[in-house]
């Protein structure tokens, strides 16, 4: 049985007639030839067998592709002619390629195609004409390609497309029109592409997305419109794209967006809007988009955000809100509902302060970038309950101090970047430095934070401070946090230094001077001694006064007794 099976497998190979491989080609695969060099105009002289199924021709000399180049190749299925400087193609060149399924003519110098050049290739499934010099296309060029599934016209010089150019391409799944000079897409251009899955229109000069242009593309999963000149998107332009998963609108000229523009694209998992001069966002922009994983709003002119802007994006994992020079404040609760958020980019904005609850509810947050802002202080509770937080970037702000426990109870924290801030290394920073002493590996080594003052600690890095002797008097007695408004109104305990002493201490710290500890404690002890002496004097006086009263009472009683005796 095994012997007969082997014979059955080998006999067809033995019966196959090998074809002669041209000297200038390689034939490493049966029925396939790979040739380079030579002239485009003399392909017929290579002597390629007519029973080939695959031909790859590349790096040939410039010339015109002649109509007899592939005569008799009726079984050819894959043909690739790339990097060969083809300047033109004679009519009828592909007439014998009736079984061709893939035609690749990439990276040539083709400026136009004869009207009927593709008519005989009715089985064609893939056509790639990218990286050429095509300026216009005949409206009937693709009329017979009813089985075409992939069409690449990218990297040409197309500025206009006839409205019915793709009317016969009902099986099309991929259409790449990127990197051309298109300024407008006519109505009805994509009316027949009900199976289209990928539409690539990026890097053109489109100025608008008109109503109805995309209405029949219900199967579309990827739409790329970035790097155009878009100034407007029609309301409801994306409403029929129920299967869309990726939408890119970045790098355009959009100053505003219609309300509810993304209300019906619930399947989108990636959305980019960055590098647009957006002035504001409508109160309602996104619908229930639980599948959205990434949202990019970088490089805009936004000065604030609607409070409920991201409320419906419960599955969002990455949110980029960076390089917005006018974004100076965040409304309360703007990130509410983003329970799955992992990465939050807020760097290179104009944020001067953050609310204490700005990050509340972001239990899965791992990275937050706040560098290159104008932050002068951070609330103590800003990072509270962010148990998954791993990295915090705070470089290039205006921070002078930090609460000692601002990063406490963050078990996953591995990186805190604090460089390029005007740190005031006085007793107000001491508790944070003490926390840092117990977490030495958390601070970045490349750009360590340095003290701006006071002398003599100016220009010292935090590492040098931690390695030196303690310079803050009795740091254990320092309050954990700055006093609150209620604390300022509370009565001052009698054992605290008086107001003159507090003012003197505050003036020394404000001037960046270290207080004279010995003088301070000497005055304090002298005050205690004076208080003790005064108290002793008062007690002594009270005793004497008591004794005097007792003497006077005794004498009065004696006088009264003597008076009664005389009577």
Swiss-Prot record:
What protein name is recorded for this chain? Answer: Platelet glycoprotein V
List, in alphabetical order, the Gene Ontology terms for molecular function in this entry.
collagen binding
Name the gene.
Answer: Gp5
Give an example GO biological process. megakaryocyte development
Q: Subcellular localization, per the record?
A: Membrane
Which segments constitute the LRRNT domain? 17-50
Cellular-component GO terms for this entry: cell surface; glycoprotein Ib-IX-V complex
Q: Which domain of life is it from?
A: Eukaryota
Extracellular topological segments: 17-522
Task: Give the residue range of the signal peptide.
Answer: 1-16
Record Gene3D superfamilies: Ribonuclease Inhibitor
The record describes the protein's role as: The GPIb-V-IX complex functions as the vWF receptor and mediates vWF-dependent platelet adhesion to blood vessels. The adhesion of platelets to injured vascular surfaces in the arterial circulation is a critical initiating event in hemostasis.
> Where does the record say carbohydrate is attached?
51, 67, 181, 243, 298, 312, 385
Identify the residues that the record assigns to the LRRCT domain, covering every copy.
Answer: 421-474
List all membrane-crossing ranges. Answer: 523-543
